[in-house]
Swiss-Prot record:
Annotated gene: rnp1
GO cellular component, one term: cytoplasm
Name recorded for this polypeptide: Ribonuclease P protein component 1
Catalyzed reactions: Endonucleolytic cleavage of RNA, removing 5'-extranucleotides from tRNA precursor
Domain of life assignment: Archaea
GO molecular function terms attached to this record: ribonuclease P activity; RNA binding
Family matches, as HAMAP family: RNase_P_1
GO biological process, one term: tRNA 5'-leader removal
């Protein structure tokens, strides 16, 4: 993740972070800054990250700024406060937004 800049265009937050590679850019606990690895568990208020050394660390979402490697290869910088809440609710909202866009674009074609 070193040396890559996040894209500045409007991005959707990935609906689930589990399995994605992340890096903690800022945190109120200085020992967690720079932590890099893969999200193994996403809970309502925390992330459990499997580090490159093989340890599992818990990071509180509301106190962190993280960078996520999205499936398309882009890097997205996210404030943890945006991620607070049940991840499954975020999936439902994401599906609703995508399906709504598809419906509105199909109306424009006719």
């Amino acid at each position: 993740m070193k040396g890559r800049r996040p894209s500045h265009r409007r991005q959707l937050i990935p609906p689930l972070l589990t399995g994605l590679r992340v890096k903690v850019l800022a945190h109120s606990d200085p020992s967690l800054e720079g932590l890099e690895g893969w999200v193994v568990v996403e809970e309502a208020r925390s992330l459990r990250i499997l580090t490159l050394e093989g340890r599992v660390s818990t990071v509180l979402k509301d106190l962190a700024v993280i960078e996520v490697e999205a499936p398309g290869g882009e890097y997205i910088r996210i404030s943890g406060r945006v991620l607070i809440g049940n991840p499954l609710d975020r999936v439902k909202e994401y599906r609703w937004r995508v399906s709504r866009r598809c419906r509105s674009s199909s109306r424009l074609k006719t």
